[in-house]
Amino acid sequence: MVAHGAITDARVAAADILTDLRAGDLLDASLERRAAGLDSRDRRWTQELVYGTLRRRAVFDAILTERVKGGLARIDSDLTDILRLGIYQLLHMRSVPPYAAIAQSVELAKRRHGIGASKLTNAVLRRIDRERDALDASRLPLPTDAIDALALAGSHPRWLVARWVARWGEVETRCLLETNNTEAPLVLRPFGIVRAQLESMLEAAGVSVDHTPLLDDGLQITGGVSLTELSAFRQGLFFVQDPAATLVTRYAAIAPESTVVDLCAAPGGKSFELARIASLVIACDRSPTRLERMRQNVTRLDARNVVLVATDARHTALTQVDAVLVDAPCTGTGTFRRHPDARWRLRVSDLAVTAAAQRLILRAAAELVRPGGLLVYSTCSLEPEENDDMVDHFLAQHVEWTHEPPPYGAVPDAVLDAGRLRVLPQRHGVDGAFAVRMRRAHS
């Protein structure tokens, strides 16, 4: 691990990423930028440190509140992040000796906030190191209020936990929180090759492969693997996609040789799944950066029937097609295990803002479907405002549209709820997803 002065570059990158998040940056973008100069091993180390710290932030703050005189409100937010990173190294990274976790955190605090901050960091982290056996989350003193206790132990915002408990109860909500705090596996989708062939290539390259939940042709890989260094990646023989996203396209069950519009398409996994069946997939996104990344994958996969279009989903100039998939921008509450920053960024008011945008996109998407054609609305949210409520409102306002369940066997019965796709992390062991098929009348 390369040192940045007396501090390793990986730790500097981790602290800088948390600074970026406070400024409003997204985790994926910040990690890509801050870890650009690190080798693959240090990048994985930095990612584990940052993701793990975010997943346990509430627990760490409870620990710090009892050990920082005057509480966390009296110290700088950046110093709080340095302490959080130090705690994660002490309690959860066995590869890091305690003296290194403490010394590096102290030096980082000194460099960024002066000698007083470094002394505080040294005292707090040394005390935590001495008391580590009593600091397991299961042993922490919890609030008497059941929701407060669950939110603290599961390290999620209280308002979200309260919503989920009202919907699913305490036991299932606890399972969801635990799922969100685990590392999401990497799942590969074969492209232009069958699963057995790709599995053989990966195992020959020393990659451990396992089966995936709910899919018989996905490959779940474990261990620190640099995908871009694999020959199968360079040959365009797979792309990365969680089973929940794959289930959305299987649920869609578009007719062979259809012309399909995939609105809000980046990063592109659903477009590539649709391309297996469709004659043409018109993949739309308004972000030039996201489209450029998707363009690179189109080239790598040689997906010749995928055409990219830069457009706002609310205002497109496209003509009517056989089918439209609306993978609507959403709060992403079904993907918190992949995006641990999102739980702390989300506000209850965001639900109304997001739903308003979704209504506009859904209305515009419906205009792109020919008479008799198919409209599929999907999200990676768990929230009813973005899912059932959205679809029910649309169907009530547009009598020419009807809900149409998928063909028998398109997806496992376990993920169907009254003909709608409903994938839940705590029940199915994958990301969350929701989708509904709607058919337009012929005239």
Please state what every model-predicted region is.
Residues M1-S443:
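S-adenosylmethionine
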